[in-house]
Amino acid sequence: MVRMWPRMLLAAVAVAALGQDLPRGQIVDGVKCAMDPSQTYAIYLPSSYSADRQWSLILAFDPRGRGKAPLEQYKDAAEKYGYIVAGSNNARNGPPEISLNAAAMMGSDIVHRFSINMKRVYTAGLSGGARIAMKVAMDSNEMAGVIASSAGFPPGERSSNLSFAVFGTAGTEDFNYLEMRQLDEELSSPHRIVVFGGGHTWLPPDLAMQAVEWMEIQAMQSERAPRDEKLLQKVFDARSAEVAAQKSELGTFEAASAMVRDFEGLRDVPKFAAQVQALQEKKTLLDALNKQHADEHFEAQLESELMDLQEGLEDGGDARTASLSQLKDRLTKLSQQAAGSEDTQERRMARRLLGGIFVDSRAVPDQEYQKFVDSLRQPARN
């Protein structure tokens, strides 16, 4: 396993002027690592970048090795809050050792070229890239935070108490939606999970802005950064407005609870703590929480049953025929629900389940099943 952080620490002691010739305020792709030119990355330097000060850094990983993809989402936040953002062109879904080596090469190259605040280094990723981002941070114990889009822990590694902050995102139609909900429940260390309208994608630019702002607050909480009263008040006011705008008791409960977690010790939060306590005493909230858990359990059960049926295709004979028949029946019904004209919970669940099938079915060696699944794919939905 490649351990990235020791290399970066050693490299950081000798910040050079190698990066002074790269343009600021725009995405630059194809930057070659000095130690291994086969390793390249895209980078965004804030327009005000200068080696006279140290800068926060986000190392980003796309599941298809598209280094520019995350930078398109993060560049506005990077410009506003003074972050350098880099995306590897070599890290991608596949053997983790390849992506971890790419992370090491990119990280080492960047701290050689640019003036980096080593207390403010973050990782970010989408799907399999999010698992790499988490793996890098879990191995280092020095990262300030991870922004994880549509996936959480790497395979076989879980922890409820992490040494870094986690901002997670999932789309309402994201096939890893349940995984991110579970991550929210598992973590006891500083974290925030936000669901947005969409699928299995990078977080949109406005949410990337919120993620970076949240990391700024966490840096103040952990004393990695000095208190910025103006920024604190700005984010506090925006989040307070979010609480007030909630249209359900469950939404208010979750938003107010997050306010207490995020701002305790930085701003006056007793009002929100009292709001949480009052809601906890209401049967209607308990009913809403129970329904939410029941819905998630139902979806997880359906997902498990579909996976079992897919495995049954490998049995051959009558067992394979029975599994295929059940899959066709269930997936046809899900496809009909997914095509609904209204944005209902049923439609969202159907699209999440189908999205997972579209990915997982690629590994199923059954041509008839593959052809059937392909017939269900829709280029675009409302």
Please provide the spans of the model-predicted regions.
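Sec-dependent signal peptide recognition
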Residues: 3-11
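A domain-start/cap signature at the N-terminus of enzymes
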Residues: 17-56, 99, 128, 239-242, ...
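Gly/Ser-rich "nucleophile elbow"/oxyanion-hole loop immediately N-terminal to the catalytic nucleophile
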Residues: 47-54, 96-127, 131
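The feature captures the conserved acid-bearing segment of alpha/beta-hydrolase catalytic domains
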Residues: 49, 145-216
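Active-site machinery of serine-nucleophile hydrolases
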Residues: 55-112
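Primarily recognizes the serine-hydrolase "nucleophile elbow" in alpha/beta-hydrolase
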Residues: 111-113, 119-164
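C-terminal catalytic histidine-bearing segment of alpha/beta-hydrolase fold enzymes
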Residues: 181-184, 188-259, 264, 270-283, ...
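Short solvent-exposed coil/turn linkers within tandem alpha-helical repeat scaffolds
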Residues: 198-202, 259-279, 314-325, 333-348, ...
